[in-house]
Amino acid sequence: MIGLVGRKVGMTRIFNEDGVSIPVTVIEIEANRVTQVKTVETDGYSAIQVTTGSKKASRVTKPEAGHFVKAGVEAGRGLWEFRTTEGEEFTLGQEINVDIFADVKKVDVTGTSKGKGFAGGVKRWNFRTQDATHGNSLSHRVLGSIGQNQTPGRVFKGKKMAGHLGNERVTVQSLEVVRVDAERKLLLVKGAVPGATNGDVIVKPAVKA
């Protein structure tokens, strides 16, 4: 089953029948319009390309405009691709809505995490801070040792150190689907999803469900 592209609206909470508070993220999923259908014969694999939302005409390049016209759809804010399996049939211009998740219990959500800039080891990797006093005057938030001795005589690749944190593709798996509101084009999932408010997210049925 394919996924859908949505927009993170924000977090809130709802109450179940027992009065228990459930923290949920609201994802707005407008109709995903099929802009291209890829097949094994023409492209070497099966997939569909979709767009969603809208884009100012002045912001659409000529190649993009031609691509959208050929598909017979309104220009969207981006293009995304989903692999399809045997038996899944889609046509150019077809609209796919949030109700495809009506019977789905859990989903995987992919987004771009919030960028935090250059961060130290404590914030980036949850390293423990060193002593505040007891003779420590300079190394409160320093990593500590980053190597061994003359052998190997280098710092191993992948060593957890200070550096750029966030602003990368992140997937949160197996989030519970709390509610599907097809009328308002909303999907409510339990817990947090990556990224800032209004960020694009990709929602797919959970691979580990």
UniProtKB/Swiss-Prot annotation:
Assigned keywords, A-Z: Methylation, Ribonucleoprotein, Ribosomal protein, RNA-binding, rRNA-binding
Q: Which family does it belong to?
A: Belongs to the universal ribosomal protein uL3 family.
**GO CC annotations?**
cytosolic large ribosomal subunit
Taxonomy, superkingdom: Bacteria
> What processing steps or modifications follow its translation?
Methylated by PrmB.
GO BP terms: translation
Organism listed in the record: Pasteurella multocida (strain Pm70)
Q: Which NCBIfam families match?
A: L3_bact
Name of the protein in its database record: Large ribosomal subunit protein uL3
